[in-house]
Swiss-Prot record:
PANTHER family: ELONGATION FACTOR 1-GAMMA 1-RELATED
Region called Disordered, residue ranges: 210-269
GST C-terminal domain mapped to chain residues: 87-215
Cited function: Probably plays a role in anchoring the complex to other cellular components.
Species annotation: Prunus avium (Cherry)
Name used for this protein in its record: Elongation factor 1-gamma
GST N-terminal domain location: 1-82
Residue intervals of the EF-1-gamma C-terminal domain: 262-422
Keywords, sorted A to Z: Elongation factor, Protein biosynthesis
Composition skew (Basic and acidic residues), residue ranges: 223-250
GO molecular function annotation: glutathione transferase activity; translation elongation factor activity
C-alpha cells in the first residue's frame, strides 16, 4: 500500500519526501486533485489535521504533518539507510544541518518572499534584515562546502535533501545569479544535487530566476462619500484657507521620493592623496623589477593619514593540516571581503612546505581603523589576530614589503600559495 502525500505538485516541502522516497524505494503517491486553500479546508482534511497543515502524509498508523518530520519518517522506513547516517555523530550532524536549513535559510527566504509576492505587508527594514541574515547563513554554508562535497560524509543524506529543497525555493523565486555568485561553493553544491537523477526525477529541469519580483504597489483606500443626510444634519464649517503650495511640494505629499542610500562612513572621511585604484593597477601591471617599481610606487602613493596597514595571522594555524582545505579557507575569506573592495587591498600568504600550514597576511584599509562594517559583516575577521603596522619600525616596514612582494622564503619558510585581494 502506497503512502499518500497531500500537497500540490509544486510544493517544495513535498519535494523533500518525494526525493527521500526515490532514495529509499518507499512508495509515496501525491493525493489526486489536491488544491491548496480548498482541499486542506474540507472537513475530511481537517480531521487529519485540525489546522489544515500542508503537506500531510497518510500512513497505516495515522497522519503526519510538518515536512521535515514526514521526510524523516519515510527515510527511517528503510533499515540501515545511509540517508540518516551510520553513526551517532553522523545522525547528530544530519539533524544539525536540517535545523540550520530550516531556521537560517528557509525562514529568511520565506521572510523575503512573502511581501514580494503580496502575502504580507512590504517593510524595507524587514526585507533588509531577512536578506542580511540569509547572506550570513549562506556564507557559513559556503565555508563548510569549500572543503565538503556533501553536508555530512561522502554521500547524499537527509540533510542534503532538505537543505537543497530550501535552496531550490530561493534559487527559483528570488536569488538571481549576481546574488548567489557571492557563494560559489553553495552554487556548485546546489547545481550538483538538483542534477542528480533522483533529485531531477522530482524537481525536473531547474532554472534560476533572472529577476527579483518588484514590490507590489499599495492601493490607497478610497474615501467614503458623505451622504446627503449627514450633510444636512451638520452645519458647514468654514474652511481654513491655507497658502497655495508649490506643485513640487504637493507632489511630495502624494508620493514621497525615494530616500538616497546612506553613505558609507568611509566616504565621509577627509579626501586622501592616495588613489587606491592607481595602486591596484600598478600592482597588477608590474611584471619585472617588482621591488623597484611596485614597492617603491606604493610608498610614494601611501597616505598614512588617510589609510592604515594591518598584519593579520590566523588564530588556529594548528588546524591547517590539509593543504587544499587551508587554501579554500583563505579563498572563502577573500570572497566574503568583497563588500570592502572599494576601500581595501590585501595579501594573504599560506606558509610552509608541510602541515600545519601558517596563514598570515597584510591589509590596507581606508581610515585609521579596520572598518566597523567589515568586522560586523565578515565573520572571518574574528578568526585572525590583527596588529596595526608601526611605520616608525623599519623591521615592520620591511615585512610589509616582503608580504606585498610574495618574498620566498618568507620568515625562513617556503610559500605554499599567495593570494591577492584587489
Amino acid at each position: 500500500m502506497a503512502l499518500v502525500l497531500h500537497a500540490g505538485k509544486t510544493n517544495k516541502n513535498a519535494f523533500k519526501t518525494l526525493i527521500v522516497a526515490e532514495y529509499t524505494g518507499v512508495k509515496v503517491e501525491l493525493a489526486p486533485d489536491f488544491e491548496m486553500g480548498v482541499t486542506n479546508k474540507t472537513p475530511e482534511y481537517l480531521k487529519l489535521n485540525p489546522i489544515g497543515k500542508v503537506p500531510l502524509l497518510e500512513t497505516p498508523d495515522g497522519p503526519i504533518f510538518e515536512s521535515n518530520a514526514i521526510a524523516r519518517y519515510v527515510a527511517r522506513l528503510k533499515a540501515d539507510n545511509p540517508l540518516i547516517g551510520s553513526s551517532l555523530i553522523d545522525y547528530a550532524h544530519i539533524e544539525q544541518w536540517i535545523d540550520f536549513g530550516s531556521l537560517e535559510i528557509d525562514a529568511n527566504i520565506i521572510s523575503w518572499f512573502r511581501p514580494r509576492f503580496g502575502y504580507a505587508v512590504y517593510l524595507p527594514p524587514a526585507e533588509e534584515a531577512a536578506i542580511s541574515a540569509l547572506k550570513r547563513a549562506l556564507g557559513a554554508l559556503n565555508t563548510h562546502l569549500a572543503s565538503n562535497t556533501y553536508l555530512v560524509g561522502h554521500f547524499v543524506t537527509l540533510a542534503d535533501i532538505i537543505v537543497t529543497c530550501n535552496l531550490f525555493f530561493g534559487f527559483t523565486k528570488l536569488m538571481i545569479k549576481s546574488f548567489t555568485s557571492e557563494f560559489p561553493h553553495v552554487e556548485r553544491y546546489f547545481w550538483t544535487l538538483v542534477n542528480q537523477p533522483k533529485f531531477k526525477k522530482v524537481l525536473g529541469d531547474v532554472k534560476q530566476t533572472e529577476s527579483v519580483p518588484p514590490v507590489p504597489s499599495a492601493k490607497k483606500p478610497s474615501q467614503p462619500k458623505e451622504t446627503k443626510s449627514k450633510a444636512k444634519e451638520e452645519p458647514k464649517k468654514e474652511a481654513k484657507k491655507e497658502p497655495a503650495k508649490p506643485k513640487a511640494e504637493a507632489a511630495e505629499e502624494v508620493e514621497e521620493a525615494p530616500k538616497p542610500k546612506p553613505k558609507n562612513p568611509l566616504d565621509l572621511l577627509p579626501p586622501s592623496n592616495m588613489v587606491l585604484d592607481d595602486w591596484k593597477r600598478l600592482y597588477s601591471n608590474t611584471k619585472t623589477n617588482f621591488r623597484e617599481v611596485a614597492i617603491k610606487g606604493f610608498w610614494d602613493m601611501y597616505d598614512p593619514e588617510g589609510y592604515s596597514l594591518w598584519f593579520c595571522e590566523y588564530k588556529y594555524n594548528d588546524e591547517n593540516t590539509v593543504s587544499f582545505v587551508t587554501l579554500n579557507k583563505v579563498g572563502g575569506f577573500l570572497q566574503r571581503m568583497d563588500l570592502a573592495r572599494k576601500y581595501a587591498f590585501g595579501k594573504m600568504l599560506v606558509i610552509g612546505s608541510e602541515p600545519p600550514f601558517k596563514v598570515k597576511g597584510l591589509w590596507l584599509f581606508r581610515g585609521q581603523e579596520i572598518p566597523p562594517f567589515v568586522m560586523e559583516e565578515c565573520y572571518d575577521m574574528e578568526l585572525y589576530n590583527w596588529t596595526k603596522v608601526d611605520l616608525s619600525d623599519e623591521n615592520q616596514k620591511e615585512r610589509v614589503n616582503q608580504v606585498i612582494e610574495d618574498q620566498e622564503p618568507f620568515e625562513g619558510e617556503a610559500l605554499l600559495d599567495a593570494k591577492c585581494f584587489k
